[in-house]
């Protein structure tokens, strides 16, 4: 399982990033039916500031690695970060990229 954190104290921003994450997850499920992610929304400024100084715009953490700061990621960027996280897991799934 991949753990993902959405960092933003503004609910509409978290919602937009969560929709992108779910779209990326659904795309990966087509080729990896056992793929799972756990999404946590970090809302408290004090918790966000432990990870990044950028608090006005959303940020994204994948398996405790800060991958996106202060912007809304594109679905295909998120797919790339999730694929990378899959490959780094013990007993990971082999990910093949299409042509």
Write out the residue ranges for each language-model feature.
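Local sequence-structure signature of Cys/Sec-based thiol-disulfide redox active-site neighborhoods
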Residues: 1-30
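Hydrophobic beta-strand residues in large extracellular and virion-surface proteins
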Residues: 4-6, 37-39, 78, 82
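Structural micro-motif
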Residues: 52-61
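Non-catalytic, surface beta->alpha helical segment in thiol-disulfide oxidoreductase systems
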Residues: 62-91
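Short acidic DE-rich linear segments
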Residues: 89-99
């Amino acid at each position: 399982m991949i753990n993902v954190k959405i960092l933003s104290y503004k609910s509409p921003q978290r919602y937009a990033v969560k929709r992108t994450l779910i779209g990326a997850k659904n795309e990966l499920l087509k080729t990896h039916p056992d793929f799972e992610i756990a999404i946590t929304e970090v809302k408290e400024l004090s918790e966000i500031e432990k990870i990044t100084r950028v608090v006005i715009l959303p940020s994204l953490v994948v398996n405790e690695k800060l991958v996106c700061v202060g912007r809304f990621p594109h679905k295909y960027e998120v797919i790339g970060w999730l694929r990378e996280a899959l490959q780094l897991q013990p007993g990971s799934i082999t990910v093949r990229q299409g042509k």
